């Protein structure tokens, strides 16, 4: 049977979404320079890649964990210390999650209802970390998700449950190793999904990818307006439960606006492993994504950072090298976001657990930064530190 001539390309809905997406990037309120626009197109490229991949990976009966965001498909102020995976769910089906626990600082699970939209954060129906499941001496674990009543090893999928999000979080990049995790429907094991090789399915997937792309861009341009930009520049909020319902995580958020002659000193107590096995700080661009965290030190965990003799960590955010260990490079971004996260908490945090911020002239740093002499780092030491970041990241194999 001859193939009929194409009257409308199957990719037309996605092509239209792509044209609209380019306008969203160009009209973003923070775009004031060629560099802003160029970075926006890098962000757009990653979002295109992710939207196409996720549209083709959508499968609720034969689910697999797919990478939600990563170094080449950033979104939502992605944490440089975190591996993000998700699988799609039906709220009336039962799933088995099995795997082997790695040595990362935290492993958490979150069931979401729907998806992020430009007007709301999705409801978190269930959220827990691996302390809520049984892990054998060899690291193996198994639990179930389904519509039944909650019990040990079984978590209820509430009405509207749509996605299981998994976060695996590093504190020591060099020493910790990721685990193994798998999801499946036991009633579908050994079967195969129906073939999806018709043009109608392809057209639907292109349309879905286009909708995903636009929603992704609109949402995460609006997200900072809800939680960041309503605060004064060069301040950070007290610790608070992280929006979106992630269990046992608090965060402190802010945005900076600095000249090349200025520095922001962020001083925060080191919570300690007994309170927060994971504590980390990062910078982000106005596109609400992480900066280059592989080749530049734009993030630090408590394990990576220098802790002063008084039990506090002092981070210096600046464009020019201040010559200290806890320099956070803003890599040409005079405006951006800064966030501290505490995870796997054993107690709620109080304002005294949060950061204090001071804006200074960079040449005042030797007088203004406590323990300045001990904090200094040579150029050779700095290059070794960056090389260690590059090597540790490469071993994650996230290309």
Over which residues does each language-model region extend?
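A compositional/structural signature for long, glycine/proline-rich flexible linkers
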Residues: 1-399
């Amino acid at each position: 049977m001859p193939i009929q001539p194409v009257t409308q390309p199957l990719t037309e809905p996605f092509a239209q979404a792509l044209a609209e997406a380019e306008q969203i990037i160009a009209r973003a309120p923070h775009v004031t320079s060629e560099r802003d626009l160029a970075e926006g197109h890098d962000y757009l490229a990653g979002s295109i890649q992710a939207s196409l991949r996720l549209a083709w990976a959508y499968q609720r009966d034969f689910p697999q964990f797919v990478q939600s965001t990563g170094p080449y498909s950033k979104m939502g102020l992605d944490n440089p210390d975190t591996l993000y995976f998700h699988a799609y769910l039906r709220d009336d089906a039962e799933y088995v999650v099995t795997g082997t626990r790695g040595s990362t600082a935290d492993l958490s699970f979150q069931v979401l209802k729907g998806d992020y939209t430009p007007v709301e954060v999705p409801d978190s129906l269930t959220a827990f970390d691996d302390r809520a499941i049984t892990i054998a001496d060899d690291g193996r674990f198994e639990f179930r998700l389904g519509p039944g009543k909650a019990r040990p090893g079984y978590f209820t999928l509430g009405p509207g449950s749509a996605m299981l999000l998994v976060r695996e979080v590093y504190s020591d990049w060099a020493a910790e190793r990721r685990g193994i995790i798998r999801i499946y429907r036991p009633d579908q094991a050994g079967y195969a999904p129906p073939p999806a090789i018709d043009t109608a399915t392809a057209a639907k997937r292109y349309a879905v990818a286009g909708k995903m792309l636009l929603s992704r861009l609109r949402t995460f341009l609006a997200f900072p307006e809800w939680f960041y930009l309503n605060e004064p520049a060069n301040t950070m909020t007290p610790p608070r439960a992280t929006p979106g319902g992630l269990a046992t995580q608090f965060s402190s958020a802010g945005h900076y606006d600095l000249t090349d002659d200025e520095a922001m000193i962020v001083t925060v107590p080191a919570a300690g492993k007994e309170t927060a096995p994971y504590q980390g700080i990062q910078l982000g661009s106005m596109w609400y994504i992480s900066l280059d965290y592989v080749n530049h030190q734009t993030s630090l965990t408590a394990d990576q950072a220098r802790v002063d003799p008084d039990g506090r960590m002092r981070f210096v955010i600046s464009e020019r090298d201040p010559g200290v260990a806890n320099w956070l490079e803003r890599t040409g971004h005079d405006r951006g976001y800064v966030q501290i996260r505490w995870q796997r908490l054993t107690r709620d945090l109080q304002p005294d657990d949060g950061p204090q911020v001071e804006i200074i002239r960079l040449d005042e740093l030797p007088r203004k930064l406590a323990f300045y002499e001990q904090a200094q780092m040579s150029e050779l030491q700095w290059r070794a530190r960056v090389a260690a970041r590059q090597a540790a990241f490469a071993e994650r194999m996230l290309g």
